[in-house]
Regions:
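Short, solvent-exposed loop/turn segments at conserved positions within beta-propeller repeat blades
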Residues: 13-20, 70-71, 125-128, 194-202, ...
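Beta-propeller blade signature
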Residues: 20-28, 77, 134, 202-210
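Gly/Ser/Thr/Pro-enriched helix-cap/hinge segments flanking short amphipathic alpha-helices
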Residues: 199-202, 209-354
Length: 354
């Protein structure tokens, strides 16, 4: 058993147990799955908590990124035939700017600075800030956490679920993170839940993007008024009104639905479908140009912590520039589509573009 200085039992730290290998399961197409972990090259024990799929090196092939608890993260680069190798260290995604492995929990992914490249954010344990890895292109990333305003506001919190989404419908990606300790601390004056969980309670955070990839805490939304032990976090337009709502789970409490009450002027929800399977084309990328501003949104990919978000692509803008819409499908082909009428839910089907 593990106890703190006061003799009270605590949850064991990751260094006190062995990790196990992650699993890659292939869908047999009949409702069953088979493990291809060993033949895919993924049979390496670790303490994985967060995972996402996306094209990390820009070669058109899906890769896997794993946030590990207390050891270097893994960037499994795909070879296009279900084989992978870990390139996290050379890509700049394994450790932070100080050369330290951190207690990785959840992952958020998206283009935070509008340069057309998908960046990564990983949440961590208290005393470790969340880490923002900026995509430099050609498979290289750098830790820009401090420069983008995330170091100081996150270092005193334990982050789990996280999501990059356009919370205020201005065309750039904002950041939300759910918090809850794993070690007892001083009890927050507004802590909810039972007496057992109150010393673990923390406020969640919503950060607004200034359009250049720098973040500040939103103090006006009332989002931080709930203080609990948050874990899972997912986003989606639950009421189909054109903005992204949030769902958060707690270790000791009911599920919470945060209804987005912003009033977007122009918005779109896009289902991105491959008719050959009649399914969402996971790994596809939607590029929306509005004047000189680019919104790049990937389809699906996972992330956060033990959560799955709405797979529809959400676009919003306050601009009135010339607009264009393009989809790069997961097989590497591309099509242009007419921009649907704004304030609508539409479907983009492969083969029906230009």
């Amino acid at each position: 058993s593990v106890t703190n200085r006061g003799g009270l039992p605590e949850y064991p730290a990751p260094g006190q147990f062995k990790g196990s290998q992650d699993q890659l399961l292939r869908n047999n197409g009949d409702g069953s799955f088979v493990s291809i972990t060993i033949e895919a090259g993924l049979a390496r024990p670790s303490r994985g908590l967060g995972v996402m799929a996306g094209d990390l090196d820009g070669d058109g092939v899906l890769d896997l990124y794993v946030a590990n608890d207390g050891e270097p993260n893994q960037a499994w680069i795909g070879d296009g035939s279900a084989g992978f190798h870990d390139a996290a260290m050379e890509m700049g995604l394994a450790i932070n700017i100080f050369g330290q492995a951190e207690a990785g929990m959840g992952i958020a992914h998206g283009d935070v600075d509008g340069d057309g490249l998908e960046d990564l954010i990983v949440t961590h344990l208290i005393s470790e800030s969340d880490t923002l890895y900026r995509n430099l292109g050609q498979g290289h990333f750098e830790d820009v956490t401090g420069a983008r305003g995330l170091a100081h506001p996150t270092i005193d919190f334990t982050g789990f679920g996280t999501l990059l989404f356009d919370g205020d419908n201005d065309g750039d990606l904002d950041l939300v993170t759910s918090h809850g300790r794993v070690l007892r601390g001083s009890t927050h004056a507004m802590a909810a839940g039972s007496s057992h969980w109150q010393p673990y309670a923390e406020e969640d955070h919503l950060f607004l993007n200034d359009g250049q990839g720098r973040f500040r805490i939103d103090a006006k939304s009332g989002f931080a008024t709930r203080v609990g032990v948050s874990r899972g976090l997912a986003g989606g337009d639950l009421d189909n009104d054109g903005d992204i709502d949030l769902v958060i789970t707690e270790a000791d409490g009911s599920l919470r639905w945060w209804k987005n009450q912003s009033e977007p002027s122009s918005w779109w929800l896009l289902n991105v479908i491959d008719p050959s399977s009649n399914r969402t084309d996971l790994g596809a990328v939607v590029e929306f140009h509005d004047g000189d501003k680019l919104q790049r949104r990937s389809v699906g990919g996972g992330g956060s912590y033990l959560s799955g978000s709405d797979q529809r692509v959400h676009l919003a803008t306050r601009n009135e520039g010339e607009r264009s819409l393009k989809v790069r499908w997961s097989d590497g082909t591309s099509e242009s589509f007419q921009v649907p009428p704004h304030r609508t839910i539409s479907t983009l089907r492969k083969g029906q573009g230009e």
